[in-house]
């Protein structure tokens, strides 16, 4: 994405200007970020998704000061009447299930893919919402249908109400209020308190971002490192502890200092190689969510497959890269030269033309076929200068 091109999506700011002035710093209200905005998925189809085990959904109802929360899958018939006020359905990761929603999410790739998470859709009847709260991540709130009133404010106190199934602030003090119409969008940095209430029936699209926590990320990397070390067991990299200078024990149960040092050195050695850690990070960042399943080609497609062909990534595929590796759906592959350039292009643009794909080496072509058999990409009739 061109970082210095002004975007209507960002109120005429360039991506570079937005990131410098607003990202993780201050809110931005954008009127008509998407002119003529209409829902990309109809209400009936959206509400049907609450019954799917492949979709993360929540049903929230407010009755006065009382809140109830049900997590999906739930029966569509159990939802209140559309004329009943004060209820909301939240559908997470709709971009994984709908091409149009997935295409909309791609407009926010001025933020690195490693940080872009998903698009959640909130459907609400009159008065519906989830109460005043704050998120630990950046969020764009795009109004797709109807109106929603937003109250926002910086919080000094983040105490939550007790006995409530939602994380609702105990003492919310709004500083500003906006009513968003279809096409309007509000950006909020992490920790900025907000309370959205439906004005009549409405749909709001929330574009959210990943915020790795240091402890959680370290835990995942160390788990991967443990598997890496297990694979090295018994090889030349697996040094055996030796203590020819060990004296006779005076304190029988005392741990020898030399053994403590050996353990410390073993861990330090494992953490010392940045390539291993970078590889594990890429695998972690591209790991599909537990609910994600791919659709491998059927037998007829397998028989008809011909390479080279146009390549279009499946909307559920996560693909990143660094200087030496390509990461796809939790797996890592070394790539160099022309292969690296073409696979990086695939990660950036989500497609390759047949002519471009023909430039891959035989080894890379075999890898592409294996990915296709997993359902990670689909053959496509792409012309040389773009997509048909």
Where are these regions (language model features)?
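Active-site region of the double-stranded beta-helix
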Residues: 1-21, 34-184, 192-240
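Long, charge-rich, low-complexity alpha-helical segments
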Residues: 10, 17, 25, 332-388
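Proline-centered helix-kink/hinge sites
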Residues: 27, 189-190
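Active-site proximal loops enriched in glycine and acidic residues that flank catalytic Cys/His/Asp
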Residues: 190, 207-209, 356, 381
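C-terminal amphipathic alpha-helical segment
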Residues: 222-301
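Acidic, low-complexity/disordered tracts enriched in E/D and polar residues
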Residues: 267-346, 369, 380-388
